[in-house]
């Protein structure tokens, strides 16, 4: 059973409707179209980790804060532009902002907006069918969800267990269940 199938099954179990599932994981980002409880199509990011949860973890570390602190900072900031497409170059850009005395809140907000923008561009390439649902670790950040909703121009739903959608889908597949 593929990772895509697991996320599709888990997303369907959590959201219960045809939708576009966006999974922002630690190493990649997936946009998955689910219809009739089946994966119909998907697209994964083709760049480095700059549009993933790992990117945010690296940047939080660079700012010297935990992920919870990072999101709290981001919610209070005015986003600075983070334009580099590569994690290494983006980290250099963040270091430059720190060196220039920019507020950590503004840097954190810029990082979240950068990731949300990359995810939105992946969605544009794939296309969105139906409602949009977010899974993966970033679904725990209300600020990321709101930012992604703004980038997409439509609401993005999440679920308290959305970070576990892949594991849930794997369990459903292992049980031989099909909706």
Language model: regions and residue ranges:
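Conserved phosphate-binding catalytic cores of ATP/NTP-utilizing and phosphoryl-transfer enzymes
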Residues: 1-41, 169-176
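Glycine-rich phosphate-binding/hydrolytic loop that grips phosphoryl groups
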Residues: 9, 53-57, 159-179
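Acidic-glycine-rich active-site phosphate/pyrophosphate-binding loop
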Residues: 24-35, 85-92, 138-153
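Glycine-rich phosphate-binding loop plus the immediately following alpha-helix
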Residues: 36-79, 86, 172
């Amino acid at each position: 059973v593929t990772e895509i199938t697991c996320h599709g099954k888990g997303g369907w179990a959590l959201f219960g409707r045809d939708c576009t599932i966006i999974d922002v994981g630690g190493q990649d980002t997936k946009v998955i179209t689910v219809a009739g409880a089946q994966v119909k199509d998907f697209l994964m990011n083709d760049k480095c980790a700059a549009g993933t949860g790992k990117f945010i973890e690296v940047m939080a570390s660079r700012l010297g804060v935990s992920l919870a602190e990072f999101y709290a900072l981001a919610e209070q900031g005015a986003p600075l532009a983070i334009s580099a497409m590569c994690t290494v170059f983006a980290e250099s850009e963040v270091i430059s902002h720190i060196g220039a005395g920019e507020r950590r809140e503004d840097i954190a907000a810029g990082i979240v907006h950068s990731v949300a923008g990359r995810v939105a561009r992946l969605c544009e390439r794939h296309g969105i069918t139906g409602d949009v649902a977010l899974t993966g670790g970033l679904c725990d950040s209300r600020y990321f969800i709101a930012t992604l909703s703004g980038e997409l121009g439509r609401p993005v739903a999440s679920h308290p267990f959305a970070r576990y959608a892949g594991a849930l889908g794997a369990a459903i597949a292992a049980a031989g269940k099909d909706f």
